[in-house]
Amino acid sequence: MAWIQLRIHTHRDNADLLGDLLMDQGSLSITYEDGQDEPIFEPKLGETPLWQDTVMIALFDAGTDLAPTIEFLESMPFLGKGFNHKIEQVEDKDWIREWMDSFHPIQFGSRLWICPSWREIPDPTAVNVILDPGLAFGTGTHPTTALCLEWLDSLDLSNQEVIDFGCGSGILAIAAIKLGAKKVTGVDIDYQAIDASKANAERNDVVDKLALYLPEDQPANLQADVLVANILAGPLKELAPLIAEKVKIGGKLALSGLLQEQAQEVSDFYSQWFIMDPVSNKEDWSRLTGIRK
């Protein structure tokens, strides 16, 4: 089945109303895009911010006559006659197959590979983590996850205890186990992340070495030789004393989820507890590492 999509440029203040109007006109779905390459940083809890110049994309059945819809929208004062829009035909595809074809095994460092379950493992002798994209958790494609995976690959984790602080999919925790860690503890505020981490650990046959906790359930005095936290700059600063006390003296720390312009400030803050290394960057993102004093 083919589709028609109507693309409309609008101000974010009008997005909710326009979305309702489009649904009333028979749109099957509404999606949003950035109209002017405007970054959005760290939304507050419960917020779903939009770009100032937002492109709204309304999907309709291929047989829909959009002329009445355009005429109706032109009567809206916030749009007006000749408003900025475009009508496009969308080719019918096997979208699930298209989506699956877009994911390939990725190598991180010298030993580690992250592989979707439907792909052939490139190097059976390497350290392979089987992980499928799903939910809103890391699969290695984002620069911050890649920075953390590369760092873990560079370490000798033999007989080390590791904490994955903000474990998400469990990708970092599972990689640490596969790279030799004797025990890994994953902590996350989202019970869905705990469930995702457990499912991925079971798929990789490492569930016996992984303990998973919500913050309120984690053991008292939890400490490790290595801690990795791929979250955001705000929580990293707010939780710095807690994170620091979880790393043994002489232990190793990696922090990511930071934009390059945020990295130095966070590094300076953590220098109270850690001997910090130079910042490592990938695209617009940074990773901080250090040794516990």
UniProtKB/Swiss-Prot annotation:
It holds the Pfam family PrmA. One of its GO terms (molecular function) is protein-lysine N-methyltransferase activity. Its EC number is 2.1.1.-. InterPro entries: Ribosomal_L11_MeTrfase_PrmA, Ribosomal_PrmA_MeTrfase, SAM-dependent_MTases_sf. S-adenosyl-L-methionine binds at T145, G166, D188, N230. GO terms for biological process: methylation. Keywords: Cytoplasm, Methyltransferase, S-adenosyl-L-methionine, Transferase. The keyword Amino-acid biosynthesis does not apply. It catalyses: L-lysyl-[protein] + 3 S-adenosyl-L-methionine = N(6),N(6),N(6)-trimethyl-L-lysyl-[protein] + 3 S-adenosyl-L-homocysteine + 3 H(+). GO terms for cellular component: cytosol. It is found in: Cytoplasm. Belongs to the methyltransferase superfamily. PrmA family. Methylates ribosomal protein L11. HAMAP family: Methyltr_PrmA (MF_00735). This is Ribosomal protein L11 methyltransferase. It comes from Shewanella frigidimarina (strain NCIMB 400).
